[in-house]
């Protein structure tokens, strides 16, 4: 049975890679013909992501959309379980959203090209001098009315436990005066584990949208660590509710 799953997963992985290359090529062509970044992001949300989730055997369930005023920009903060998280979030969030990605992603063919063409931001780990510049870029993106999503744990969870949220990048939301939306992901780590495609299995992924956290109260900024702790607690509460 394990051999059969390995063969199946290898075939699906190859098909998903071809699907990804095709959609990215189409998005890059659209950008070259004058389409905006948001158009290319919607292509991912409405075309690429549903195909990836279907190929992986994912049944996506989204809860809490009614809690958010989608006419406003937000910083979305989510727990991180799997590389398929991005596809789930692209599909779940009803607005174009950019991601804060590892700097290594910029060098990956197709993925890096698409990320640059759609205004994604890149973080250089352990590079202290890049932090202030990244926060300014993120704040400018949010202030311009665009949504941004990041994984404040800093890396994917190996155990399924949600690590404490790092607060540094949340300063961008404070500077831009936009709210932070906690997002809970459940099931992605079982569909596509950190260990690789050999352990991949079809299954459900649940996405929960939390209540927006205002970054300013009576004109005064809320401390970013307090925001990180509250977002972390809200994500944990949604996950416990589903347990």
Identify what each model region corresponds to.
Residues 65-69:
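Glycine-rich helix-loop-beta junction characteristic of Rossmann-like nucleotide cofactor-binding loops
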Residues 20-41, 55, 70-128:
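Catalytic core of membrane glycerolipid acyltransferases/transacylases, capturing the structured
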